[in-house]
């Protein structure tokens, strides 16, 4: 079976928030396949590269002295952020307040960690701050904002969310897993330099073009990560703050290689190209009579019918739906104008 199998190509993938790794990231991943950053005392080189990855992520997110690590992905990073918030709080009945459009990983985190998840409704695809304010109380341990939502690519009012968290002595966590590598080239207020954010998720293996797995968790204050530490008596290091023990050195090395190659000029060019493609597709769909959610980042959602979407899937296009039923197209780095022209041509055939 393996000898006959071919890896997934990206020629018709329009639904994924992962993409083709940068050539330098691919080469670095292959070189460090057998390394484990979970044992930094033994694998000193990859431990050093992980520190470099965190420094790059801090530069991208406005954090001059970043703490954090390279995680398996956004789900782990979000769970760990909630774990930090729960562990530091003085309450027996912790709750987390998040937008209704927050990633489903927060549902997982609430289940695993035994915290209540309260969701605030959205207004115009961003969290309704008045509704969110009604949900926080003295047992709120974390208030979450999303910087580039999975369904629509919209950015919540992060400074207002951080201010709200401060009123109840809760942490503020921002999920920028997908949007974090696009947002530096926009006018949005979304990062540590814009607001009193405590923790952030940002994934190099999405728009950052690292190889999977390479997520990222950042913290403003290193003492926050102490909430995650457990003793490791049989390793060369004395404690560990990551969720998984063995981790991918390939992911760490590829993240450094990608960011070294692309930050900032390459990512800026990538954003401009992807945003232009999203705007072009939105115009094409709108001209054909579809209601389109105007793209704020390179993601287009439109009201294509389920039969139409099914036909596109039958023709090999990988597309997905929002919770409300719109078709969504994520204009990742591998998505070209030529691809989108072919997509629209198949849409016209229907």
Curated annotation (Swiss-Prot):
Cofactor(s) the protein needs: pyridoxal 5'-phosphate
EC number(s) reported in the record: 4.1.1.11
Top class in the EC scheme: lyase
Stored SUPFAM superfamilies: PLP-dependent transferases
Catalytic activity, as annotated: L-aspartate + H(+) = beta-alanine + CO2
A GO molecular function held by the record: pyridoxal phosphate binding
A Pfam family of this chain: Pyridoxal_deC
Domain of life: Archaea
Sites bearing N6-(pyridoxal phosphate)lysine, chain numbering: 206
Reported function: Catalyzes the decarboxylation of L-aspartate to produce beta-alanine.
Sequence similarity: Belongs to the group II decarboxylase family. MfnA subfamily.
Protein name: Probable L-aspartate decarboxylase
Source organism (scientific name): Haloarcula marismortui (strain ATCC 43049 / DSM 3752 / JCM 8966 / VKM B-1809) (Halobacterium marismortui)
